[in-house]
């Protein structure tokens, strides 16, 4: 049985070998390029299903708050303008935007597989099918989850005798984040990953993501010196910094799950 100290040393060794700080920076750049195409695809899919009309506003709030917790209103206005402009594009332009979104998913796929040291690549056709499924079904899953959460929230708010339920309801965003991370760490690597290892890594990532968002918002609000330096351009560095922190959290959780997998395989041998 490996000690906690040795586990920590192995985790840090793998984290350094995989250069996850630099990888988070590269994914941040890819995310900035793919953000508008992703949002365009998501809301285009939502517009095709009238049942999601009521949750579209909540989805926008969730996306903008997670990408830039302290500047969500301004980011939301910019993204809305970009998406509105994209509707005037030709078919070739739209295909190009979708290709950029698929490239981001491909980068995420390759990054997570490298963390698991998986050299077995999927066939191009299989990869495209999986990426397209993520791009199309992902928004629907998120929409259904938001709709269910909204329904539960309304149900609890209409009752005066469910104060405990209202308190428990505050954990729904965390549980949803935990579930999404667990799903990513289990499905994306092109190898069998034990669900409990994915859940452990996802739990750590969900905690860091939730606390990090609150701490980041507090820092930006409490120490607004960045506004004096950047002025009207302050939103851009804020968003870049938060996206990089978010990717670092995702990669830390993935590395934890991968390290647990590695130790588990050594014990079985």
From Swiss-Prot:
Any one annotated GO CC term: plasma membrane
Regions crossing the membrane: 32-52, 89-109, 128-148, 168-188, 203-223, 232-252
Alphabetical keyword list: Cell inner membrane, Cell membrane, Membrane, Transmembrane, Transmembrane helix
UniProt membrane topology term: Multi-pass membrane protein
Subcellular location field: Cell inner membrane
Chief localisation class: membrane
Pfam family of the protein (one): Virul_fac_BrkB
HAMAP family hit by this protein: UPF0761
Family per similarity comment: Belongs to the UPF0761 family.
Name of this protein: UPF0761 membrane protein HI_0276
Species the sequence originates in: Haemophilus influenzae (strain ATCC 51907 / DSM 11121 / KW20 / Rd)
């Amino acid at each position: 049985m490996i000690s906690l100290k040795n586990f920590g040393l192995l985790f840090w060794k793998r984290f350094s070998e995989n250069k996850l700080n630099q990888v988070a920076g590269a994914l941040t750049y890819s995310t900035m390029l793919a953000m508008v195409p992703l949002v365009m695809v998501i809301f285009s899919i939502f517009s095709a299903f009238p049942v999601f009309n009521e949750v579209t506003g909540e989805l926008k709030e969730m996306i903008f708050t997670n990408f830039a917790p302290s500047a969500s209103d301004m980011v939301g206005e910019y993204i809305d303008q970009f998406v509105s402009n994209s509707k005037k594009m030709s078919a070739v332009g739209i295909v190009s935007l979708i290709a950029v979104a698929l490239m981001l998913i491909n980068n995420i796929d390759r990054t997570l597989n490298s963390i698991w040291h998986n050299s077995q690549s999927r066939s191009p056709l299989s990869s495209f099918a999986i990426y397209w499924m993520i791009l199309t079904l992902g928004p629907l899953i998120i929409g259904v989850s938001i709709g269910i959460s909204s329904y539960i929230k309304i149900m609890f708010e209409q009752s005066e005798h469910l104060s405990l339920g209202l308190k428990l309801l505050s954990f729904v965003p965390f549980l949803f984040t935990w579930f999404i991370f667990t799903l990513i760490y289990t499905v994306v690597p092109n190898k069998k990953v034990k669900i409990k290892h994915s859940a452990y890594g996802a739990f750590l990532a969900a905690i860091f993501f939730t606390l990090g968002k609150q701490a980041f918002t507090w820092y930006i609000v409490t120490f607004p010196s960045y506004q004096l330096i950047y002025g009207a351009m302050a939103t851009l560095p804020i968003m870049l910094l938060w996206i990089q922190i978010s990717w670092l959290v995702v990669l830390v959780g993935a590395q934890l799950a991968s390290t647990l997998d590695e130790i588990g395989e050594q014990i079985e041998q």
